[in-house]
């Protein structure tokens, strides 16, 4: 079944909506209420994504599972450490998978971006390495902030720091995607060539 391409605003809403709910709930109540609201919003976003596109993006699915697990631990044990370390776990997981894939000659970032970019193998390799390093850096940054700053500061960073940093980093990769862009005709020829080799 072909995946339906969601409207950009819908995609933005499902990605940023849960974070805004988390921020608002923390501002009005406390981190534990915010955690519960965040979990509900994450599940709602995944359901909405599946209803509209018949597909849940891999990153969203992994993030949702980690949020539910660590959110539940936060609420059951009444310990905010779990929800604060959650981004570190997610960033480290993505960095590890991307970096590990490169060691075995695989570019798993292509699975996440294949509906947007057509790149040469070298392009995917460089893009994967950059994102792996970025996620590793974000994991370290999250650890530094939640361990040294107040809860409110950490929440503000999560919404107004981590998100802009990710968007800026993604935009900084545009020159790379243009440099290693693979034209559709070239891509088809490459696929055909690979098919002949396999025969």
Curated annotation (Swiss-Prot):
It is a multi-pass membrane protein. Belongs to the YciB family. Plays a role in cell envelope biogenesis, maintenance of cell envelope integrity and membrane homeostasis. Keywords: Cell inner membrane, Cell membrane, Membrane, Transmembrane, Transmembrane helix. InterPro entries: YciB. The chain crosses the membrane at residues 7-27, 32-52, 56-76, 93-113, 126-146, 153-173. It is found in: Cell inner membrane. The gene is yciB. PANTHER family: INNER MEMBRANE-SPANNING PROTEIN YCIB (PTHR36917:SF1), INTRACELLULAR SEPTATION PROTEIN A-RELATED (PTHR36917). GO terms for cellular component: plasma membrane. This is Inner membrane-spanning protein YciB.
């Amino acid at each position: 079944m072909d995946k339906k391409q969601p409207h950009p605003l819908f995609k933005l809403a499902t990605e940023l909506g849960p974070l805004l709910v988390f921020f608002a709930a923390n501002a009005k109540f406390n981190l534990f209420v915010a955690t519960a609201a965040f979990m509900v919003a994450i599940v709602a976003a995944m359901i909405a994504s599946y209803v509209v596109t018949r597909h849940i993006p891999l990153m969203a699915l992994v993030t949702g599972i980690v949020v539910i697990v660590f959110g539940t631990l936060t609420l059951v044990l009444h310990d905010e450490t779990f929800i604060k370390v959650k981004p570190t776990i997610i960033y480290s997981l993505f960095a590890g998978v991307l970096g590990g894939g490169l060691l075995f000659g695989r570019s798993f970032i292509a699975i996440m971006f294949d509906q947007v970019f057509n790149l040469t193998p070298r392009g995917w390799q460089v893009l994967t390495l950059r994102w792996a390093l970025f996620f590793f850096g974000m994991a370290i940054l999250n650890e530094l902030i939640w361990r040294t700053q107040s809860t409110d500061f950490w929440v503000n960073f999560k919404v107004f720091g981590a998100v802009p940093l990710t968007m800026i980093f993604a935009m900084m990769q545009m020159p790379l995607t243009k440099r290693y862009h693979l034209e559709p005709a070239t891509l088809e020829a490459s696929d055909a060539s690979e098919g002949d080799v396999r025969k």
